[in-house]
């Protein structure tokens, strides 16, 4: 995801194309 928005309590990250990529919290640590 180029533009990652991490929602609290969620592992879903939306990229610029409006598609959803599933990541774990640890990906951002």
UniProtKB/Swiss-Prot annotation:
It comes from the Eukaryota. Binds to bacitracin. This is 28 kDa protein.
């Amino acid at each position: 995801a180029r533009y990652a928005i991490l929602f609290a309590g969620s592992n879903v990250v939306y990229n610029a194309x409006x598609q959803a990529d599933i990541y774990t919290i640890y990906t951002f640590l």
